[in-house]
Amino acid sequence: MRIFAYFLSSLLIFTTVNSKEFRIDFSDEGMKTLKKRGFGKKTLYTNGKDDKGWYLKAEANDSATGLGMEIEKDLLEEMPFLNISFKIERDFDVIDQKTKDGHDWTARVMVGHGKKIGAKLVSLAHSSFLEEGFLQQSPWTKGSRDYVISNDKSGEWHTRKINVKELLEKTHGISFTN
């Protein structure tokens, strides 16, 4: 099964209420700052530009890897909100994302604290089968949570604004005050 997801860089940004922002850049130059995460080379990433700005397209068959970057904890304290825009071209037909066998997402952005196994992670995910706001412990790891931010089936771009700092504090008890 081939799954497509697009992420729009002009809206994949960390912001504050004071309008500071940190953009994740999907231009050719910006792509050099993203590191491949996961095992193998299972996802094809291409970038492009349309009237809304640069975007990242991910294509995967059966399993996927990710792209990532490290940001300082201070940045999350200063800019707790993540604005993410994405469009799902093709979704899963049937899948039970609550189980280990069906634990797969058409699109997700993982945020977390820590670099090694045991890191505290939250997957901000799209699901056509679960309600927005659904939260569960990952069936694969104790330190990872799945949080559904979208179940839109329109095939159009949609944007969500998530307070990542608050979500990490709520799901993992991570303190950002020290």
What are these language model-derived features?
Residues 106-109, 146, 154-178:
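Extracellular beta-strand ligand-recognition surfaces/modules
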Residues 2-9:
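Sec-dependent signal peptide recognition
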Residues 71-82, 101, 151-154, 176:
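Extracellular/lumenal carbohydrate-interaction signature centered on repeated Trp-anchored short motifs
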Residues 19-38:
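Extracellular carbohydrate-recognition regions
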Residues 89-156:
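Extracellular ligand-binding interfaces
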Residues 12-16:
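Hydrophobic core
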Residues 46-66:
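Short carbohydrate-recognition loop motifs
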Residues 26, 73-93, 162:
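Extra-cytoplasmic beta-strand recognition segments
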